[in-house]
Each structure stands twice: as structure tokens, then as C-alpha cells.
Amino acid sequence: MNCAIMQPTFLPWAGYFNLMSQVDHFILLDDVQLEKQSWQTRNLLLLNGDARWVSLPVKHDNLSQSIRDTEFLDTSRWSAKLMRSFQQNYGKHIHYAAARDILDLLEFQPEDTLSTFNEQVIRETAKRLGIRAHIHRAGDLRISGKRSARLISICQYFDAEEYLSPVGSADYLSEDSFAEKTTISLKFQKYKPLLYPQKGSQEFVSHLSIVDVVANLGWDGARQYILKGVIDE
């Protein structure tokens, strides 16, 4: 049994779903603090031939608010602008309809918060990619603790024998002496995004949102692309 623990980010890139595809349990840290100009609220799409940020319109009420409590500003104009831009830049892609499936998920409900909104998009995208990991909210588990101590407690909750982490977390896990604090095996994701035929760019642009992958490859192609990026030991 293994697990991975990540924040529910906005329109994640392919590597996010690669991580999810390798675990039994995927836990969304839905109660972390809101960070300005972070992956929580923005991601990259290919617009006018360049990687451009697309950001969610959220309310910044106080410095300590969690993404679980973060509400949205008026979204009607934002949604209309995004759809126009998407149509202009991806409308002629062979798999436009497949990518539009993701954009159609960006329908805001009055009760939505940043975490529940991102979670819904992540869950539905993972389903379309054929990913079978069980997805959970960390906030529902009522497990306290800081940094790696909380990660260990979450892994123990699911009787996980292995924790799979993105390589970007290696430094802080080392600083926290994660491996010395538990018998849970610590493994790092080995994923290298491959090139794919990318319409609209003169040179390949990596690490864009999964939307770009699906627009160029379709759902079946995106599924294969995500799995092929794993680097063998």
C-alpha cells in the first residue's frame, strides 16, 4: 500500500497525474494556507505561442486563510474571457473537444471554495485519464501536525508502507529527517515529461497544464503520455 500527498492545484500539469497514477491513495492537502501567485490559483497554457499564466479570481481576506475557506470574486467575466482565449488558441487543435471537457468543469457553484473547486477538476480529469487512485481530503481526516510529521501520520492512517513524493520535496523531507522518524519507505517520483506534437508553438514548451496535453493528444494519448514519462530505475 502506498500514498502520495499533494495540494489541490489549479489545472495541474501531467506530472501531477503521473504521481497520482502510481499510488493507491492520493490525499489532497485541502486545508493549507493560501499562497499568493502559487499553483493553488494559477497554471500555464500556451497562448499566442507562449506560456502564459491563467489565474483564478480569489478573495484574499486575511494572511492566514486556508484554501478550504478561500472564496471567489465575480467569476462570470473571468469564465467568459477564459473560454474566448481557449477557443482562439486551441480551437483548431485536433483534440479540442477533449480539452474542452476540462474547461467545461470550470463552472463555479455558489458554495465553491478554492479547494473544493480544484478538487472537482482534479477528480474528473483523473477519471477521464483512467487513474484509479482513491482520492481523499486531508481536512476530513482531522490529523494535526506540521510538515513531515503530519505526512507520516496521514500515511499511517492509510496503513501505507510507502510514501511517494515529488522530487521537489526532497530537501525539506531531508531537513525534517523523514526517513529517520518512520519505518515507512520514502520514494521519489521519477518522471521526465517527454516531447509531444504541440500545435501553436515553434519550440516545444514543457510543464504546461494537462489541458495542453489533452488538446494535442486526446484522452487516450494523454493517458499513455503520462505513463511513459516514468524513468526506470
Regions found by a protein language model. Give the residues of each.
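Residues lining hydrophobic/aromatic ligand-binding pockets adjacent to catalytic sites
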Residues: M1-E233
